[in-house]
Amino acid sequence: MEDSAIASTLASDTYGLDIVDTNIQDMKNNTTRFLIMSKELQQERNENLSYLTSCIFEVKSVPSALYKALGGFATNGVNLTKLESFIVDGDFNKAQFYIDLDGHAEDQSVKGALEELSFYTEKLKVLGVYPKHSYRNN
């Protein structure tokens, strides 16, 4: 085998690929997320859908910075579904955080939460907005 990929059976059917193995996940409900990148916001708000928004931010290096940064989500009623930390450039005094939150970046509550977040961050970037899959509603 010269080249290989982890892909869906749909990719196999579409591109005529051979399936070497199936169900290779290490956890029963494992999921893989794929991204479509764009310089402009592409996901217009549809009132009939629920959304997730993904962001990345770097807190200021001061006591309680993360606590204060996250407070805006609580006061605006925005649920965080994921929070991951990363060390920036090997500097243990700087942390960058990835978050997923319930809601669309254009929702008033999300706008308010992100505005409050920006007061306590060095950098803040909305990575994307996408429809929430129905399995997340359980």
Question: Across the structure, where does each feature detected by a protein language model lie?
Answer:
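Domain-level signature for soluble enzymes in the chorismate/prephenate branch of the shikimate pathway
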Residues: M1-N138
